[in-house]
């Protein structure tokens, strides 16, 4: 049973491609979150974040 890593519920073979997929998903979540924060900031203070909103 060597070479198997369990991430939350699903167990994957500890393969580089699987690790890359997990990292890409985390990066996408961070990007989406930061985009959401920017949109909220644009609504709260549109003058200060005007250059970002354009």
Curated annotation (Swiss-Prot):
GO cellular component: host cell membrane; membrane
Keyword annotations from UniProtKB, A to Z: Host membrane, Membrane, Transmembrane, Transmembrane helix
Positions of transmembrane segments: 32-52
Membrane topology: Single-pass membrane protein
Localization annotation: Host membrane
Name assigned to this protein: Uncharacterized 6 kDa protein
